[in-house]
Amino acid sequence: MDTVEISRFLTAMTLAVHIIFATIGVGMPLMFAIAEFLGIRKNDLQYIAMAKRWAKAYTITVAVGVVTGTIIGLQLSLIWPTFMEMGGHVIALPLFMETFAFFFEAIFLSIYLYTWDRFKNKWTHFLISIPVIIGGSFSAFFITSVNSFMNTPAGFELKNGKMVNVQPIEAMFNPSFIVRSFHVITTAGMTMAFVIASIAAFKLLRNRQPKDTVYHKKALKMSMIVGFFSTLLSMLAGDLSAKFLHKFQPEKLAAYEWHFDTSSHAKLLLFGVLDEKTQQVKGAIELPGLLSFLADNSVKTKVQGLNDFPKSLHPPMIVHYFFDLMVTMGILCFVISGVYVLTLMFKKFRKFSNHKWMLYGILLTGPASMLAIEFGWFLTEMGRQPWIVRGYMRVAEAATQAGGITFVTILFGILYIILMYTCAYVLIRMFKNKPAYEDVNRLAKKQGGEIEK
């Protein structure tokens, strides 16, 4: 592997780790805010205990996310110096605003954690969760703006290889910003809901602490409902993304579906094997006209093929598999959550909502949704190749030529293993031998009674 490929691998590895914690950073505040809202609204201490436990766990993931996020910022400057020299001043505003959003979130998260039972009106404490949600979401908005700029650059003029006459607001709110941000936020909410649901399902299947059954059933119900509606929004975001790509990045959409010749009634391909020399696909599931329909709501829509673009500008064909895997994981989560919600809607089927096989299905949604996030980011980043800034700078032109990058990659790989292991270990230890019913009892005692003995 040459320096460019190693630099790409290191960046991909860093992003793959960071996106886990970034997703939690956007989704978890929403979940513990909903739990607290339900706890106050229903006067139910089970939900209050959820909010307290989830917020406590969230602090650990925030700490690790700060580390991985800082590393990404450093790697932009150290591994991709030519890119930062050319466009660093253009993306400076969203990078600064992302830092501001993080500190905004951190301040209110601290207040949220240390002011339980400090207010006579319980809704006052709940309101503190809203700035935490805003901070996490805006942090995602601003960092997504940087990535969107790399896909659809705007707000500058290029003179003598330099970006001049910069319009920071136009650059930040570039053409793909709204669609991509919507997709990021909805999928983060979806993923966090399903991760929580899968943990609740796991606890119910093991049933090592019967006194926690009510707690986990309520956590399961809440998170699956949130997951279902978040999945609907994510599917809408995905549909809007396809239409955006058709208009602004047609070569990317064509690569996703191995669509080589411009045509209407373009078919959607699921999986299969491509012979790049003959451009023939074998073994794929073909859905006639669906690619055209995704592009512009009509099977008659003409979709540009890859053969309209120079071969040197074609994204890697492997992106097709990432697209199919992302969609498959999303559909799996949608079907399972949809079936669960249907069992709640009809009284005679409610007993199946906590059936063993339903719980096994829900157990899959956590890993599946997180994998969908990972595949989605591999898809969008590899789909931009060979550009680091589409139409202006190639990846090969932006990478560092400094030696020792292989050694640095190995060091970071070891660091990420240690970080992931430490985070998992601390989270497990945080709740090991500390059943939820004990937290519920402590809350009940403060109100003059005890639920469980």
What are these regions (language model features)?
Residues 1-453:
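Polytopic transmembrane helical bundles with strong interfacial aromatic enrichment
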